């Protein structure tokens, strides 16, 4: 039996742009994709912290170190520049894979740069809440 678990998360990104006329997806700075282990065209869930909207789309790379996080296509209607979002991927794990598994959590600053010295957030630190 497989169970679905959070695989990776980019926490508190800031939307830098929306592009209604683009075919679809969310463009994400390649540096953030690499840090989170997200590959191009992988399914992602995006949660908008400003308006509560949730959507499922796929990730495409934006230039590395650009800080770009852009909602494209119809998804552009669900956010505006400056909104804070959480980007998540999930994985199907077997019972054997579950033990010891921890998702990859990437914390970013307001310019969507990885916070290198951020504390590790996992099940053993539920009291940690970043603003």
Curated annotation (Swiss-Prot):
Keyword Cytoplasm in record: yes
Report what the protein is called: Aspartate 1-decarboxylase
State its Enzyme Commission number(s).
4.1.1.11
> What is its EC class?
lyase
What residue range is the signal peptide? none
Q: Which GO terms describe its molecular function?
A: aspartate 1-decarboxylase activity
Where does the protein end up?
Answer: Cytoplasm
- Primary role: Catalyzes the pyruvoyl-dependent decarboxylation of aspartate to produce beta-alanine.
Might you name a Gene Ontology BP term for this protein? pantothenate biosynthetic process
Key word Cytoplasm present: yes
SUPFAM superfamilies in the record: ADC-like
Catalytic site positions: 25, 58
Q: What keywords is this UniProt entry annotated with?
A: Autocatalytic cleavage, Cytoplasm, Decarboxylase, Lyase, Pantothenate biosynthesis, Pyruvate, Schiff base, Zymogen
Catalytic activity reads:
L-aspartate + H(+) = beta-alanine + CO2
Its ancestry begins with: Bacteria, Bacillati, Cyanobacteriota, Cyanophyceae, Acaryochloridales
Q: Which residues bind substrate?
A: 57, 73-75
Q: What family does this belong to?
A: Belongs to the PanD family.
Q: What GO cellular component is one of the record's annotations? A: cytosol
Source domain of life: Bacteria
Quaternary structure, from the entry = Heterooctamer of four alpha and four beta subunits.
Point out the gene that encodes the protein.
panD
Task: State the free-text cofactor note.
Answer: Binds 1 pyruvoyl group covalently per subunit.
